[in-house]
Amino acid sequence: MSDTLNQLAEVLEARKNAAPDSSYVASLYHKGLNKILEKVGEESVETILAAKDAAASGDCSELIYETADLWFHSLVMLAALGQHPQAVLDELERRFGLSGHAEKAARPKS
């Protein structure tokens, strides 16, 4: 895993026990999972809108910025639920080389 993701995972874990007024992430943890999920949803919408703008303008700088926000808040969500970013990378690695149809067919039926 990249050094950046590892370092970020360590910081996110450390912020779980920090005072809410000490950092943005600590304040999110203090507000609870629903607030974190709200931020993930907000950043998802902003990323989609930035992609539409990038397609029209050819400038992807805002798309990259918003995608970083989405990834960051997704990592906060994972950490709040006790998951490390490596779990997502492991899942992507598991899927690598599978066709989309084969991956979908292999999913458990619910």
UniProtKB/Swiss-Prot annotation:
Pfam families: PRA-PH. Disulfide bonds: none annotated. Gene3D superfamilies: MazG-like. Keywords: Amino-acid biosynthesis, ATP-binding, Cytoplasm, Histidine biosynthesis, Hydrolase, Nucleotide-binding. GO terms for cellular component: cytoplasm. Its EC number is 3.6.1.31. Its main location: cytoplasm. SUPFAM superfamilies: all-alpha NTP pyrophosphatases. InterPro entries: HisE, PRib-ATP_PPHydrolase-like. One of its GO terms (biological process) is L-histidine biosynthetic process. Coiled coil: none annotated. It catalyses: 1-(5-phospho-beta-D-ribosyl)-ATP + H2O = 1-(5-phospho-beta-D-ribosyl)-5'-AMP + diphosphate + H(+). GO terms for molecular function: ATP binding; phosphoribosyl-ATP diphosphatase activity. It is found in: Cytoplasm. Pathway: Amino-acid biosynthesis; L-histidine biosynthesis; L-histidine from 5-phospho-alpha-D-ribose 1-diphosphate: step 2/9. Belongs to the PRA-PH family. This is Phosphoribosyl-ATP pyrophosphatase.
